[in-house]
């Protein structure tokens, strides 16, 4: 018995993951499956760990100032967005000034 998985990256590159489910000295098929699932989990963690590291390096290389900012949004957009209504269907959340 074995577990198979396939990861397709953003560029369309395929990577197959294959893990045998035979643990040495284990005769129970469920224990063997559990061992295989644990191994698959480790493979997936390694795969995504390397993907995350590569993406982080790409971001720093592409735009070091933006990567250090920690804000993925456009800063000029924040400055121009002064109307922060949450409910456009209802009345304004601001208190109306009464004439004195």
Curated annotation (Swiss-Prot):
Membrane spanning residue stretches: none
Domain of life, source organism: Eukaryota
An example Gene Ontology CC term for this record: nucleus
InterPro entries, A to Z: GON7_meta
A Pfam family that the UniProt record links to this protein: DUF4611
Primary location: nucleus
Keyword annotations: Acetylation, Nucleus
Residues found modified as N-acetylmethionine: 1
Subunit (UniProt): Component of the EKC/KEOPS complex composed of at least GON7, TP53RK, TPRKB, OSGEP and LAGE3; the whole complex dimerizes.
Function: Component of the EKC/KEOPS complex that is required for the formation of a threonylcarbamoyl group on adenosine at position 37 (t(6)A37) in tRNAs that read codons beginning with adenine. The complex is probably involved in the transfer of the threonylcarbamoyl moiety of threonylcarbamoyl-AMP (TC-AMP) to the N6 group of A37. GON7 plays a supporting role to the catalytic subunit OSGEP in the complex.
UniProt-recorded name of the protein: EKC/KEOPS complex subunit GON7
Gene: GON7
